[in-house]
Amino acid sequence: FDRDSDLLKKRINETAEDYSKIYEYIRAIKFLSVNNLGYDIILRPHPSEDIETWEIFLKDIPNVHVIRKGPINAWVHNSFAVMHNSCTTAIEATVSKKPVITYIPFEQKYASQLANKLGHRVKSLDELLKKVNNVFETRENNNQNELGNSLPDILLKKLYLDDELAAEKMVKVWEKIE
């Protein structure tokens, strides 16, 4: 901090924004839990987050579960949608053609711009409830493969996907090494 006097201020502002996001996310989960159409809400903490903290924040809410078991792709695959704010799981959900709901309740300076450009962007609790319930109601009518045959432009600029398995590509690289 001695070399850059603005660095301390930036770190404090980033941390304050993170705490505000957590507070708003908890409010959103509690709001959805009371006003939803009968679905359960799974909160999967980031690997760097303390799961016990989330369990304390969300305890005694019957249809909310804090779970970190297994790989994220299984949870994405078995969900009807993914709600997030600044989470790279939105990228995985988009690639998997799973509906993504990006909840941005206030202007954020330090958030992941790529992840927050994906999915249905909502700013208020009422917008969030309407979008989540709409996705839930129409989930059986939507063929997930029809959510879009191509990825959003923002991801096409960042990802290259083809039909070749990663293991096959590695073998080809190894075979080229003399």
Where are these regions (language model features)?
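Conserved catalytic-core segment of nucleotide-activated headgroup transferases in glycan assembly
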Residues: F1-F57
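Catalytic binding pocket for nucleotide-activated donors in carbohydrate/polymer assembly enzymes
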Residues: L7, E55-I61, T88-D162
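Active-site donor-binding acidic/aromatic loop of nucleotide-activated sugar
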Residues: P62-K69
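Short acidic active-site motifs
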Residues: G70-A74, E127
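Structural alpha-helical scaffold elements that stabilize or flank donor/cofactor-binding regions
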Residues: A74-V76, L114
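Acidic donor-binding loop of glycosyltransferase active sites
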Residues: H77-H84
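C-terminal alpha-helical cap of glycosyltransferases
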Residues: Y160-E178
